[in-house]
Design a protein with these regions (language model features):
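Cytochrome P450
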Residues: 1-380
């Protein structure tokens, strides 16, 4: 989950404030944590897990809160769920979800790219991937809204309550599955329940809940935010819509990655120093926390001289939207596929424009992207 100071003077566009962070190598936030904004420092932190540990959260986080051998084993066990073959098998289901969602669009009527499209698609796409029942949709949509509100507040008590609510949903799903008659796994969640550690131990209930929380709890909101950012970009850059309709999948994915670099909704991750070390000319003591601000790093003028310039090919190698190093996002293949299917589906049949008389509303730190983007999808 993204974390950084929750009071921000640049309400109209928090990226202005993030861009200002580049003036100093490191800064302190309201919680006395080091904020890492420069691209080279962000890369240095996340590629050195021995010096900068990912074991920060008070909650068990598998695999993103693990280090060393435990993290390596978790990735070996879980990364196959995102294999190319699995993504190819999932694609037709996502196409079906997209068709069903877009069939409900009324021509000429304003809808919110984040809530009406992004959030609903995120829940339906993740449910299709995991084999979760459609009846969960209202509960998951309500949870997403409450989770963003709690994160926005910066109050640990509120975020803890929301986290426990999501864990309760997962426990309920798991209990239903465990009372079923034995047989081959019916879906991906069934497969996950049967995963075993390298020494033969089955994953514990707390580990399974953590994995599913990581896969869904964060990704539901992130996918909705990405949808809002992408459709806002399409609406404000109409010439790109025609270009992307004719693009190959690889070119389309690079374009979306670049849009997300320019306006990265994955704001930050934390690390904690394990030893005394120097970073950007600052002395970091053991036990001190760092907030790696991905949004700022992806707009570092030392790497991207004009951060708002759209260059999918030229900027690809330095793009940090999905992180880098041993903790590079394992779910990138899934997120890329989900976004491609939805956004291609939108562009295949529609031209996107901002709804007249409305103003998109930015999310506020520590959440990125937009809270609402009113758009109209005009039939081609």
């Amino acid at each position: 989950m993204s974390e950084c100071p929750h009071h921000h003077p640049f309400a109209d566009d928090p990226r202005i404030g993030y861009d200002a962070l580049h003036a100093e190598p490191l800064t302190r936030d309201a919680h006395d944590r080091w904020v890492v904004a420069r691209h080279r420092d962000a890369v240095a932190v996340v590629t050195d897990p021995e010096t900068f540990s990912s074991h920060v959260s008070r909650f068990l986080q598998v695999p993103n809160g693990l280090d060393g051998a435990a993290h390596g084993e978790a990735r070996e066990l879980l990364d196959p769920f995102f294999s190319a073959d699995r993504m190819a098998a999932l694609a037709p289901l996502l196409e079906e979800v997209t068709r069903g969602l877009l069939a409900g669009v009324t021509p000429g009527q304003s809808l919110d790219a984040v809530l009406d499209l992004g959030s609903v698609y995120a829940v339906r796409a993740q449910s299709a991937w995991l084999g979760w029942p459609a009846e969960l949709e209202p509960e998951l949509l309500a949870w997403m809204d409450d989770n963003h509100a709690a994160t926005r507040s910066g109050e640990l008590s509120r975020t803890a309550v929301v986290a426990h609510r999501f864990d309760a949903i997962i426990h309920r799903l798991l209990s239903f599955r465990r009372i079923r008659k034995p047989g081959p796994p019916a879906d991906l969640t069934d497969e996950l329940i049967r995963v075993k550690h390298h020494d033969g131990r089955p994953l514990g209930e707390d580990e399974i809940v953590s994995v599913l929380r990581n896969w869904t709890g964060g990704d539901l909101g992130s996918l909705a935010l990405c949808t809002g950012v992408a459709l806002y970009w399409f609406a404000t850059h109409p010439e790109l819509q025609d270009e992307l309709r004719a693009a190959s999948d690889d070119d389309f994915d690079r374009a979306v990655d670049e849009i997300l670099r320019i306006d990265d909704p994955f704001v930050s991750n934390r690390r904690v120093a394990t030893v005394q070390t120097d970073l950007g000319g600052r002395q970091i003591g053991p036990g001190e926390q760092l907030v790696v601000n991905w949004t700022a790093a992806n707009r570092d003028p030392d790497v991207f001289p004009d951060p708002d310039r759209y260059d999918p090919v030229g900027h690809a190698a330095a793009n940090l939207v999905y992180g880098t190093g041993p903790h590079v996002c394992p779910g990138r293949p899934l997120a890329t596929l989900e976004l491609r299917v939805l956004l291609r589906g939108v562009l295949r049949e529609h031209r996107v424009r901002l709804a007249p008389g409305t103003t998109p509303e930015r999310e506020q730190p520590p959440v990125g992207g937009f809270r609402r983007v009113p758009v109209i999808l005009d039939p081609l």
